[in-house]
């Protein structure tokens, strides 16, 4: 199993109200310039938020939800501080409820 860290909020907040796209674009460029594999993803309607251990968090976030998930704890901490009004947490995946950490609902 791998520990994934995340921030989550409504899709509208993460994709329209916060400059998240610019932050992620810059990070992708930095990774490319330094030959680092991408270890973060933005997910719309992420299934991992429905895991039983995140049930309370899932119910607090307006739908549709969005999240940035990563194996890099420092990056998610940075995003949490930068975006401020987001939920955050961590989760071991895959687990008995979810095999694909990047799975999304249609």
Which residues does each predicted region cover?
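Solvent-exposed, low-complexity segments and loops of surface/extracellular structural proteins
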Residues: 5-6
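Polybasic, proline/glycine-rich intrinsically disordered low-complexity segments
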Residues: 54-106
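Well-ordered, non-membrane alpha-helical segments in soluble/globular domains
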Residues: 16-28
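Short acidic, S/G/P-rich loop/turn micro-motifs used as interaction or catalytic elements
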Residues: 10-19, 47-51, 74-76, 99
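Eukaryotic intrinsically disordered and solvent-exposed regulatory patches
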Residues: 25-30, 53-55
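Eukaryote-biased feature marking scaffold/signaling PDZ-domain proteins and nuclear chromatin regulators
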Residues: 35-38, 63
